[in-house]
Each structure stands twice: as C-alpha cells, then as structure tokens.
Regions:
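Membrane-interface extramembranous regions
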Residues: 2-159
C-alpha cells in the first residue's frame, strides 16, 4: 500500500514503514547517547571514563557506558536519521547496523570483560541488548525492506 506522505513508502499491516522505522531507531540511539551524559539517569556518573572497562558509569543503573560508548550511540542515531531518507539507505541502516550490533555481541561474549579488550565497555546487560538490537534491526530491515526491493525490481523490469 502506498501513502501520500512518501510515494515509495510502504506500510505493513502493523503500520510500520521502512523510512519511519529507521528514523525511529535513529532517534532512540540519539536519545540513549544523550541520556548517557545525564547524571542520575546514568548512575556513578563521576566514575565515567573516556573508554575502557574501568568506567563505572551505568546507564539506567544497568548498562555500562563510557564517553566513547555514548558517542557511538549518538553517531548511530545521526546515521539512522540521515539514512532514513530513502528506502534503500533505510534498509541498509537497519540491516547493516543490526549486523554491527551482532558483531559487538559476539565480541562482548569472547573477550574478558576485565581487560583492555573491553574498550567500549560492555557488561552482560550490554551483550544481551546488542543481541536483541542486532536481531531486531536485521529482522525489521528484511521484513519492511522486502516490498521496497520488490517495487524496485518491478520498476526496472518495466523500463
């Protein structure tokens, strides 16, 4: 189904569109990045380091964060907003970003969290979140991007 808001934007039964989903994910990443710099929302704020497992700051008291970790969230958010402009780029953001988060999940599983290899830093809660984000972003990109890719293929065949 095509909407008047964007000629190539398809909405699925749940009312989701590829563009809006990528934009929403980008906004969430921006919000998380900003919240990571707010004392109170981030506990042990004074113990935050630029990077590394020594950072004692915990977003919402659960997720270990550092300045670098917060900057990564902000950059992912900016990328999501910028890439949400076209269906192809929105799909790339969701699937590619999801793949990055799955790589981070695997990395977080195999490193010793008490060493310099844990430079972002990660804790167990971060690892679970990275798995969920990776699977969700790839799933949404594949599911919502399916119609956009079908339309592109059909349009090329008509030419």
């Amino acid at each position: 189904m095509t909407t008047a808001s964007h000629p190539t934007e398809h909405h699925h039964a749940m009312g989701l569109s590829l563009h809006n989903t990528a934009m929403g994910v980008g906004i969430v990443f921006l919000l998380v990045g900003v919240l990571g710099f707010i004392p109170g929302i981030t506990t042990n704020y004074g113990a935050m380091t630029f990077a590394g497992h020594e950072s004692g700051a915990m977003l919402l008291g659960v997720f270990q964060v550092s300045i670098l970790h917060n900057i990564v969230h902000l950059l992912f958010g900016v990328a999501g907003l910028a890439m949400a402009r076209t269906g192809r780029m929105a799909r790339l953001f969701l699937i590619g970003g999801g793949a990055v988060y799955l790589v981070l999940w695997i990395y977080g599983l195999i490193i010793n969290q008490e060493t310099g290899a844990n430079f972002v830093p990660f804790n167990t809660a971060d690892n679970w979140l990275h798995l969920i984000l990776g699977v969700a972003m790839i799933g949404l990109g594949a599911w919502l991007g399916r119609d956009a890719m079908d339309e592109t293929t059909t349009a090329r065949r008509r030419m």
